[in-house]
């Protein structure tokens, strides 16, 4: 990367640059790539099979399969489409949420403000106002039909079921409107027993510890071309 930058490129092509690295080194290098993206302003074409890398670094995605383009659009939109989960990974399906650091509490948590409220995650060494993109996996979201009390889960967001889609033989994917799009994956039995239907108001529950550092990345500055 250093040698490439010395030539003052107009565009950088990174083809699986982190494939041979362990998780700790990947996270470190991704931080450097984020800073390159934001400080130098050089467009980067980033090729990878690792969804966590792409969702952390990219603002625009082109999804390829069998030699052709399956979908193209913003990373937020692509990750919000359940029909693409066979390509993006059913186990990793979820939503991307653009947030800003609102502050830090006395218990080692960072508060990330977004349209739907405040998302509390494990502490980040970032200043207030820093833009952060959070990836919330559908399997990490639970549903309640009434606001819960005496609960260890800190992230509780009121919202409405926008869509419901069967996912495999026993699961149901719910698209929730909590001010932004959020996905929840629950069992079809739970959906039936709770009487869930599109339009119903519910509460989305997200454990803070389910959102690890690999699910968070510095968002691209909004005014870049």
Indicate residue ranges for each PLM-predicted region:
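Hydrophobic anchor residue at the start of the ABC signature
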Residues: 1
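Internal alpha/beta loop-helix hairpins
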Residues: 34, 38, 48-117
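Conserved catalytic motifs of ABC-family nucleotide-binding domains
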Residues: 8
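Helical segment within the ABC ATPase nucleotide-binding domain
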Residues: 26-40
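Catalytic Walker B motif of ABC-type/P-loop ATPase nucleotide-binding domains
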Residues: 12-16
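Short coil-to-helix N-cap segments within the nucleotide-binding domains
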Residues: 20-21, 36
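Glycine/charge-rich catalytic "coupling/switch" loops of P-loop NTPases
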Residues: 116-165, 183-225
């Amino acid at each position: 990367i250093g040698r490439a930058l010395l030539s003052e490129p107009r565009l950088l092509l990174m083809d699986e640059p982190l494939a041979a690295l362990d998780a700790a080194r990947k996270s470190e290098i991704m931080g450097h790539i984020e800073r390159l993206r934001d400080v130098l302003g050089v467009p980067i074409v980033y090729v990878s099979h690792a969804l966590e890398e792409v969702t952390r670094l990219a603002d625009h995605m082109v999804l390829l399969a069998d030699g052709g383009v399956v979908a193209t659009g913003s990373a937020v939109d692509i990750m919000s489409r359940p029909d693409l989960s066979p390509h993006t990974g059913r186990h990793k399906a979820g939503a991307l949420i653009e947030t800003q650091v609102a502050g830090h509490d006395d218990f080692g948590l960072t508060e990330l403000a977004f349209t739907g409220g405040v998302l509390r995650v494990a502490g980040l060494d970032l200043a207030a106002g820093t833009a952060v993109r959070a990836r919330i996996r559908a399997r990490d979201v639970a549903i309640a039909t009434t606001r819960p009390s005496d609960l260890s889960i800190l992230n509780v967001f009121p919202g409405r079921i926008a869509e419901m889609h069967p996912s495999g033989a026993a699961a149901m994917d719910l698209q929730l409107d909590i001010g932004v799009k959020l996905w929840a994956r629950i069992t079809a039995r739970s959906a039936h027993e709770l009487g869930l239907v599109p339009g119903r108001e519910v509460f989305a529950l997200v454990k803070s510890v389910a959102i690890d550092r690999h699910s968070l990345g510095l968002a691209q500055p909004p005014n870049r071309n």
